[in-house]
Regions:
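Positively charged n-region of N-terminal signal peptides that target proteins for export
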Residues: 1-5
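Flexible loop/hinge segments at secondary-structure junctions
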Residues: 20-306
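Bacterial N-terminal signal peptides
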Residues: 6-17
Length: 306
């Protein structure tokens, strides 16, 4: 079964279908985490035919809106739920389990023809991306660099990657200059940076790994003179500052009463470390994955099986 792309539907259908309705699972959220979820679903499909899993990528913020409205069972998230989203869930009676599944690094990328920049400091990145930025050309960052206009690419405002990047770099979630090319589809961002010599963009590390022949990976200096690029080691040990981040799935507790959903989430946690490595992300240490499994067990305790 091919992996789904934007707002696609992954359907797992039994070979001989009766007239009964099929169990269904609805997932939406982060375009970063959906890559892991698609891979998990593909393996789940082979072992559990007859379950229909629908998956979309509205971005972390868009996913939480649907989650708090009770429209989906699982929200893929590239950041933790914020207080506004948490309150929306509480007001609508949506209880949930927060399950960390992996680590990721936000990659800072340029066009391969860029031969003048290998690293940017957090201070420089803030100057580029903050609201009201006066940085329009590469030479505005460093007079020795080209006078050509910087073409900026990044995720849209519903993206958890956007939220995490703006908080880590600018200092406030969502604070960003508006004049950049935005997309919730990271593949669109890859194509944008690939097609413009003077481009600069950011998105999840897995998308760089998948397209490394088309892009140049830049390092980030947090201000201590150490320029670090994201890698499995630098992300896991948080040496890649400040753009290493945890990835999550949020599961609606009431949905766990459905055997198909419960089995899917258990399968997810049992197989995610293997799958994460194959999709370009960074697996959790065993003790952290065990905490996610414990959180799921605690959520299951009081749930009656349907």
């Amino acid at each position: 079964m091919p992996r789904a792309l934007v707002a696609t539907i992954i359907c797992v259908v039994a070979a001989f279908q009766s007239g009964c309705s099929r169990p269904s699972i609805k997932i939406d959220g982060s375009s970063t985490v959906i890559r892991i979820t698609e891979a998990v679903t593909e393996e789940f499909a082979a072992k559990h035919p007859g379950v229909r899993v629908t998956g979309g990528r509205s971005g972390t913020g868009g996913g939480f809106k649907k989650f708090s409205n009770g429209e989906i069972d699982i929200c893929d998230a590239s950041r933790r739920i914020n207080e506004i989203e948490r309150k929306a869930c509480e007001e609508r009676g949506v209880d949930f389990a927060e399950l960390q599944i992996a680590f990721d690094g936000i990659s800072l990328v340029a066009n391969p023809q860029n031969d003048w920049c290998d690293c940017l400091t957090v201070e420089q990145l803030k100057a580029i991306w903050q609201p009201g930025s006066k940085v329009a050309r590469w030479s505005d960052i460093n007079p020795a660099w080209p006078t050509a206009e910087i073409k900026l690419y990044g995720p849209g405002t519903d993206s958890g990657t956007f939220d995490y990047f703006t908080e880590a770099i600018v200092g406030k979630t969502g604070a960003c200059r508006p004049d950049y090319s935005a997309s919730e589809d990271d593949n669109v961002l890859v194509m944008g940076v690939e097609g413009d010599k003077y481009a600069l963009g950011f998105f999840g590390l897995a998308y760089f790994e998948e397209n490394k022949e088309k892009l140049k990976l830049l390092g980030v200096d947090p201000g201590d003179g150490n320029c670090t690029k994201p890698s499995e080691d630098s992300v896991r040990n948080l040496a890649y500052k400040p753009l290493s981040r945890p990835l999550f799935i949020y599961v609606r507790t009431s949905s766990l009463a459905r055997p198909a959903l419960r089995e899917y989430v258990e399968f997810y946690l049992d197989n995610v470390s293997k799958i994460v490595r194959s999709t370009g992300y960074v697996a959790l240490p065993d003790e952290m994955l065990d905490r996610s499994k414990q959180a799921l067990d605690e959520a299951l305790v009081a749930i009656p099986v349907q």
